[in-house]
C-alpha cells in the first residue's frame, strides 16, 4: 500500500529535518481535506484528528473513537490513540511523549506554505484551534511550517507511485489514439470532442487529473479560447485547423497531464512545421538542463530562450510543473521568478520527481501548436515517460 511507503519516507524526512515532530491536524475531510493526508492515511476522517511523525521515527494517530479501528486496520501507525470528548489532552500527551523535556524550544511542524497549495493544508480555523489547545503548555508558540517535509514527501515518488503514474500515461495515450483513429470527424464542435472523451473516461471508470469541467481542454482552430477554457458548441473542426487537446487522466489515484495536436489536412504547411520544430526544440532545451540540483527557474529560462531565439514570443506560464496525485501537484516549479509563483521556481530539482515540459505558440490562421510531455528525474538528468510527439500529426478524417 502506497501510504505505508510514504509513512516510511516521512520518518526519514522528519529525522533529517529541523522539526521535533510533524503534525497533520484535520477534521471532517469529506468536503475539505488536507492534500497530504491521503499520502499517509488513505481514509477519510470524521472528527478532529492528529497524525504525528516524531523525530525518533515513532508515529501516532490521535483520532475519534469511531475512526480508530479503521486506522489500525490500515496499518503504519505505531500507536492509534482514540478519544471521545476532546482531542486536546490526548494530543498534548503524545507531544509530551515524543518531544523530550530537554528540548527547550520545540519545533512542531504543521502544514502551512505561502507558495505551495499542496503543502498548505491546515485551515485558518484549525490553526487557531490548535494554537488555543497548546496555550499554557510548553508547546505554546512552537508551531512552524513543515513544508521542508511535506513538499519532498509529495514530490519524491516511490516505485508504486511511479508505476501508477506510468499507468495513467498509457491510458491517456490510448485515448489519444482512439480519438483520432475512431472518433474525431471534421465538422465536430469542440464540445462534441470534449463530451466524447469524457464519455469514454467515464465508461472505463477512470478519474480526472483536474476538475471534470474543463478536462480535457479542446481547441479547434484560431478562434478557440486559449488556456483553461471551456469547449464551445459553435466552434468546429475544419480544414486548415489545428486540433489541440490537453488531457489529464487519473488511474490508481495518480495522474497524467499530456498535450497533443494535429493538423487537419493532407500536408502540414511550412509555417506550422516551423512552429512545431521550435516548440520541440524548446522542450529539448529544458530537458537538456533538467537534472538534480538545478533550480526550477533555470530550466524555464532554457526553454524560454530557445523559443524566443526561434522568433516566437515567450509563453506566459511555467514550462513545467510536478505531477502526482493531481496533474498540478505542487513542489518545485519549472517557472520564471514571477510574484504569482512565490518561491516555487527557486526550489531545487530532486531525483524521482515527475514534471511536465510544456509550451506552445499561436498560429493566427490555424490555432495553437502546444505540446506537453512528462519526465521523471533520474540520478543525473531526466527520462521521458511519455511517447514524445516531435512532429505535427495529420488528421484527415
Where do the language-model regions lie?
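Active-site neighborhoods and metal-handling regions in enzymes and metal-associated proteins
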Residues: 1-397
Amino acid at each position: 500500500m502506497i501510504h505505508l511507503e510514504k509513512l516510511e519516507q516521512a520518518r526519514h524526512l522528519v529525522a533529517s529535518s529541523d522539526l521535533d515532530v510533524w503534525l497533520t491536524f484535520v477534521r471532517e475531510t469529506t468536503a475539505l481535506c488536507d492534500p497530504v493526508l491521503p499520502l499517509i492515511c488513505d481514509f477519510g476522517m470524521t472528527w478532529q484528528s492528529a497524525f504525528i511523525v516524531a523525530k525518533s521515527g515513532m508515529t501516532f494517530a490521535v483520532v475519534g473513537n469511531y475512526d480508530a479501528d479503521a486506522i489500525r486496520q490500515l496499518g503504519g501507525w505505531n500507536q492509534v490513540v482514540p478519544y471521545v470528548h476532546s482531542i486536546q489532552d490526548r494530543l498534548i500527551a503524545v507531544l509530551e511523549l515524543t518531544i523530550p523535556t530537554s528540548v527547550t524550544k520545540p519545533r512542531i511542524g504543521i502544514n502551512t506554505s505561502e507558495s505551495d497549495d499542496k503543502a498548505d493544508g491546515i485551515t485558518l480555523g484549525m490553526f487557531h484551534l490548535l494554537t488555543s489547545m497548546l496555550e499554557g503548555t510548553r508547546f505554546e508558540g512552537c508551531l512552524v511550517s513543515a513544508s521542508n517535509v511535506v513538499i519532498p514527501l509529495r514530490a519524491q515518488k516511490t516505485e508504486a507511485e511511479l508505476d501508477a503514474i506510468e499507468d495513467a500515461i498509457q491510458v491517456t495515450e490510448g485515448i489519444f489514439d482512439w480519438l483520432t483513429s475512431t472518433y474525431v470527424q471534421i465538422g465536430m464542435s469542440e464540445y462534441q470532442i470534449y463530451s466524447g472523451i469524457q464519455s469514454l473516461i467515464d465508461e472505463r471508470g477512470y478519474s480526472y487529473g483536474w476538475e471534470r469541467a474543463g478536462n480535457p481542454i479542446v481547441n479547434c482552430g484560431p478562434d478557440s479560447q486559449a488556456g483553461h477554457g471551456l469547449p464551445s458548441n459553435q466552434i468546429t473542426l475544419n480544414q486548415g485547423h489545428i486540433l489541440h487537446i490537453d488531457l489529464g487522466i487519473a488511474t490508481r489515484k495518480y495522474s497524467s497531464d499530456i498535450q497533443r495536436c494535429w493538423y487537419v489536412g493532407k500536408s502540414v504547411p511550412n509555417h506550422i512545421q516551423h512552429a512545431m520544430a521550435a516548440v520541440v526544440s524548446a522542450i529539448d532545451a529544458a530537458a537538456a538542463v533538467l537534472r538534480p540540483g538545478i533550480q526550477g527557474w533555470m530550466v524555464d529560462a532554457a526553454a524560454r530562450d530557445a523559443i524566443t531565439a526561434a522568433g516566437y514570443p515567450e509563453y506566459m506560464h511555467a514550462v513545467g510543473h510536478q505531477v502526482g496525485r493531481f496533474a498540478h501537484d505542487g513542489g518545485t516549479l519549472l517557472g520564471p521568478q514571477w510574484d504569482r509563483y512565490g518561491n516555487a521556481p527557486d526550489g531545487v530539482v530532486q531525483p524521482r520527481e515527475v514534471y511536465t515540459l510544456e509550451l506552445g505558440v499561436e498560429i493566427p490562421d490555424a490555432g495553437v501548436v502546444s505540446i506537453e510531455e512528462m519526465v521523471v528525474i533520474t540520478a543525473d538528468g531526466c527520462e521521458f515517460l511519455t511517447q514524445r510527439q516531435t512532429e505535427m500529426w495529420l488528421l484527415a478524417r
